[in-house]
């Protein structure tokens, strides 16, 4: 895959439930602490190395941001780092929180 794909929150949720992909959240630490998808890994410049070390490059990665815009650049970056399949989640955390309010965690 040379380009990331966009995915809606319902499809992202299904992939996560079926363990077909991992979810990363690239929002700032304060926003992440105020609420994030339960299974999201907080991906920052500081945690990128650990994420890459702990996740196989053939494991699909779904990238979440605020509204689905910033995640596109991060998704492309992860492809350039060698990940085979990367998705940008349309609507970002705001759409996730609206559609799956029971699956939002709080704190870092």
Curated annotation (Swiss-Prot):
Its EC number is 2.8.1.1. CDD domains: GlpE_ST (cd01444). The keyword Flavoprotein does not apply. Transferase that catalyzes the transfer of sulfur from thiosulfate to thiophilic acceptors such as cyanide or dithiols. May function in a CysM-independent thiosulfate assimilation pathway by catalyzing the conversion of thiosulfate to sulfite, which can then be used for L-cysteine biosynthesis. NCBIfam families: PRK00162.1 (NF001195). Transmembrane segments: none annotated. This is Thiosulfate sulfurtransferase GlpE. Gene3D superfamilies: Rhodanese-like domain. It is an enzyme of class 2 (transferase). GO terms for biological process: glycerol metabolic process. It catalyses: thiosulfate + hydrogen cyanide = thiocyanate + sulfite + 2 H(+); thiosulfate + [thioredoxin]-dithiol = [thioredoxin]-disulfide + hydrogen sulfide + sulfite + 2 H(+). Belongs to the GlpE family. HAMAP family: Thiosulf_sulfurtr (MF_01009). InterPro entries: GlpE_sulfurtransferase, Rhodanese-like_dom, Rhodanese-like_dom_sf, Thiosulf_sulfurTrfase. Keywords: Cytoplasm, Transferase. It is found in: Cytoplasm. Residues 17-105 form the Rhodanese domain. The gene is glpE. GO terms for cellular component: cytoplasm.
């Amino acid at each position: 895959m040379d380009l990331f794909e966009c995915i809606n929150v319902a499809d992202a949720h299904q992939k996560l439930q079926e363990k077909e992909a991992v979810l990363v959240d690239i929002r700032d630490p304060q926003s992440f602490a105020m609420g994030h998808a339960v299974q999201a890994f907080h991906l920052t410049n500081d945690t990128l190395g650990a994420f890459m070390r702990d996740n196989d490059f053939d494991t699909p990665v779904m990238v979440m941001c605020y509204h689905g815009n910033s995640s596109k650049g991060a998704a492309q970056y992860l492809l350039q780092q060698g990940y085979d399949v990367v998705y940008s989640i349309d609507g970002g955390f705001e759409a996730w929180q609206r559609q799956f309010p029971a699956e939002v965690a709080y704190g870092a």
